[in-house]
């Protein structure tokens, strides 16, 4: 039997190598519980603790996040504490909005420190400075940059001023968030940990996903979506079927945070009615049954715009940085992105060719630049 031993050893080694190689290359099952959060932001004017409790009771079995977006509630430390206690005790994660520091009668830094000790990982972080990019694009009274001679100057000034607002709390809380509908790239250059792309009106959801997700990827950050008004008057919010489709789109596109913006209080639960709660529950059930759908729409294509090009990308004649008119590239950029939406849906990202682009372009199978023809 001895002469056969070397041959047997060779066979065993070969089989072992095959098993090892196969295990390394065999497709791994998707994460059974991908880390993502879905919930409602209660932002009614003069929200009280009873409003918070009512909404928590309504959605706690099919959400895992609650956002306190009513600044009046946060002005009062007692009502804020009562609200957060109730949210936490019902198993939901917490995000709160803080606004102008001079409106608070208590030390907000101290409150954040205590909240993190008290709620642990149940406190996700702070929502700080709403829509900085959107304000720059369309709100003259709130623009950080009122005058600039070049796109480069506007980009630098915008980022510098916004960073000061974000950094006010950067040492007091683990995560800082905002929601926006433009200029994501430059907001991510500050210390925001995640930005929620707004699904608003009839604006292309895929376009905003491409801009927000692309910026997050380039800066090593997270991203999310927030579903806001469809109409400027009642009923304000989209119908239940549209909500379900938006929730599904955000989930398959890989949004870590998915939030429903709820304002004003035109009914017992704000702008939300039974059809919206039914859609939210249906979505929750879908995520539990289909965790493999999370992030299943991959961004395999990238579209790269010039550095510092703060084009709003909401229409072909949108402004640049809110202070410059559209230029010779604007219509082409709009048409290019629209063509990519038609062809790839949410399967592409928008990037900018500055120092933060780096090797991120290597993640994509195909990269188009602004000066190329897209067929």
Language-model regions, residue ranges each:
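Glycan-processing catalytic domains of CAZymes
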Residues: 5, 23-375
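N-terminal Sec-pathway targeting helices
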Residues: 1-16, 20-25
């Amino acid at each position: 039997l001895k002469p056969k031993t070397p041959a047997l050893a060779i066979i065993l080694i070969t089989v072992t190598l095959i098993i090892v190689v196969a295990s390394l290359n065999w497709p791994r099952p998707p994460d059974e519980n991908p880390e993502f959060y879905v919930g409602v932001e209660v932002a009614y004017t003069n929200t009280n603790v009873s409003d918070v409790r009512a909404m928590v009771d309504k959605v706690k079995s099919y959400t895992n996040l609650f956002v306190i977006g009513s600044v009046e509630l946060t002005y009062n430390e007692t009502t804020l504490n009562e609200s957060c206690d109730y949210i936490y005790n019902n198993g939901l994660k917490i995000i709160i909005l803080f606004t102008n520091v001079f409106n608070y009668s208590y030390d907000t830094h101290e409150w954040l420190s205590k909240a993190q000790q008290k709620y642990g990982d149940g406190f996700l972080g702070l929502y700080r400075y709403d829509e900085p990019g959107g304000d720059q694009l369309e709100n003259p009274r709130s623009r950080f940059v009122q005058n600039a001679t070049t796109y480069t100057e506007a980009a630098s000034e915008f980022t510098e001023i916004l960073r000061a607002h974000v950094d006010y709390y950067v040492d007091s809380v683990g995560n800082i968030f905002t929601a926006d509908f433009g200029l994501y790239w430059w907001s991510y250059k500050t210390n925001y940990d995640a930005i929620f792309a707004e699904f608003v009106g009839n604006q292309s959801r895929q376009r905003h996903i491409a801009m927000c997700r692309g910026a997050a990827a380039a800066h090593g950050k997270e991203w999310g979506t927030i579903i806001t008004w469809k109409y400027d008057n009642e009923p304000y919010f989209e119908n239940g079927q549209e909500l379900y489709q938006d929730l599904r789109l955000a989930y398959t596109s890989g949004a870590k945070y998915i939030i429903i913006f709820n304002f004003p209080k035109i009914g017992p639960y704000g702008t939300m009615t039974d059809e919206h709660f039914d859609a939210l529950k249906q979505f929750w059930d879908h995520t539990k049954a289909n965790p493999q759908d999370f992030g299943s729409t991959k961004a395999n294509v990238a579209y790269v715009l010039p550095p510092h090009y703060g084009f709003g990308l909401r229409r072909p004649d949108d402004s640049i940085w809110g202070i410059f008119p559209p230029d010779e590239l604007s219509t082409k950029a709009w048409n290019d992105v629209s063509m990519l939406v038609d062809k790839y849906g949410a399967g592409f990202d928008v990037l900018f060719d500055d120092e933060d682009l780096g090797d991120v372009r290597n993640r994509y199978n195909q990269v188009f630049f602004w000066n190329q023809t897209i067929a």
